[in-house]
From Swiss-Prot:
GO terms for cellular component: host cell cytoplasm. It comes from Murine coronavirus (strain JHM). Keywords: Host cytoplasm. Not essential for virus replication in transformed murine cells. This is Non-structural protein 2a. It is found in: Host cytoplasm. Disulfide bonds: none annotated. The keyword Protein biosynthesis does not apply. Signal peptide: none annotated.
Amino acid sequence: MAARMAFADKPNHFINFPLAQFSGFMGKYLKLQSQLVEMGLDCKLQKVPHVSITLLDIKADQYKQVEFAIQEIIDDLAAYEGDIVFDNPHMLGRCLVLDVKGFEELHEDIVEILRRRGCTADQSRQWIPHCTVAQFDEEKEIKEMQFYFKLPFYLKHNNLLTDARLELVKIGSSKVGGFYCSELSIWCGERLCYKPPTPKFSDIFGYCCIDKIRGDLEIGDLPPDDEEAWAELSYHYQRNTYFFRHVHDNSIYFRTVCRMKGCMC
């Protein structure tokens, strides 16, 4: 009998796509909120505009797996490039929300990766991508309102690296300056800021380097077997994928060899 799939129906975290850093979007978003104020409606305005990509039920010791899942998505972000469309202000329960189109494939893939890494992700009910504008004390009928914004979602757009981020946020986290205080916040543009200095790992590293790199990392980051560790480092180095960035960020020895382009053993 197949194992029953676990859902985050009692979530404690979510993967967040913050929006406060996009000035074009924020100009229209704040204008929409000001219309609610001018209409004299008693509501709580959303101070942290965002899109929840998926909900999670995880423990703190799984944060690294979430980080690696996000980094894995960023490795393939070109597959999700396009425009994110915000439109159709309407009531969803007690909240006035915008429909969001363009994150469907990203949602499906990050849920799959998170589950593969042992994290309980997504809910048994259908995911409805939306951006909350305001919350009311009770369900309310709102007269037709207009909103449309197209946000380019590209690693590089008009020669500028993206401002997009993917975050891990604990439900109930405090809010500062339009953003949640997150457990992890990963800039999508870092995918283009890292580049191995040589085509092959073996061009500048030797087997003697493995223990020095392992000593800079947390236990379990690298396989205990040197050959397996070498294979993993070589694979990610030559493809410029997430684990290369992780080791580059956390191993002084690894960064030094990359900078010097030569083993120092």
